């Protein structure tokens, strides 16, 4: 996983980059699935306003973390990551935080940045959607995320 400089990202006053960094450190150290799922949940809370249904710019690189968990961490971490991305689909950017400054490509809208990362991971998501391991409980979520990608970003989706 590429190192993310969470402190470099802009956001509202209640965006706490140190919480995102701490969640990533816990995820890297996690051995048990429940530890990894909790770290992913903490990352989700660090990069969004869950109560208002709004995204901070840090949600864009966090999407890569969730996609990596979907691809590599079956069980509770995979489900936590799928749930986060499905919940975010259609959310609005936090007012005043509508763009993400990508260090490689420049400024991008949050929805566009998030969708681009999911689009780039579509092959992996198809494999996960077809994977019956662990009882296959993750399959509907992976299929729904792919369907949402095909439908585009919509306030009604989230």
For each predicted feature, which ranges?
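HEAT-repeat alpha-solenoid elements in large eukaryotic scaffold proteins
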Residues: 1-2, 34-47, 85, 92-102
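Flexible loop/turn segments at the boundaries of HEAT repeats in alpha-solenoid HEAT proteins
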Residues: 12-14, 51-56, 92-100, 107-115, ...
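Core helices of alpha-solenoid repeat scaffolds
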Residues: 16-21, 55-63, 117-122
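Short inter-helical turns and helix N-cap capping residues of alpha-solenoid HEAT/ARM repeat scaffolds
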Residues: 31-32, 71-78, 132-139
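Eukaryote-biased recognition of C-terminal alpha-helical segments
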Residues: 107-114, 119-158
């Amino acid at each position: 996983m590429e190192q993310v400089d969470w402190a470099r990202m802009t956001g509202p006053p209640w965006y706490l980059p140190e919480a995102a960094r701490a969640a990533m450190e816990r995820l890297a150290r996690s051995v048990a699935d429940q530890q990894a799922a909790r770290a992913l949940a903490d990352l989700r809370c660090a990069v969004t306003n869950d109560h208002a249904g709004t995204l901070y710019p840090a949600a864009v690189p966090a999407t890569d973390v969730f996609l990596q968990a979907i691809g590599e961490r079956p069980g509770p971490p995979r489900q936590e990551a799928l749930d986060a991305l499905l919940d975010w689909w259609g959310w609005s950017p936090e007012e005043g935080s509508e763009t993400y400054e990508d260090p490689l490509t420049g400024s991008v809208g949050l929805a566009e940045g998030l969708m681009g990362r999911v689009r780039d991971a579509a092959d992996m998501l198809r494999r996960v959607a077809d994977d019956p391991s662990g009882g296959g409980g993750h399959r509907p979520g992976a299929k729904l995320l792919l369907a949402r990608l095909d439908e585009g970003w919509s306030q009604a989706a989230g």
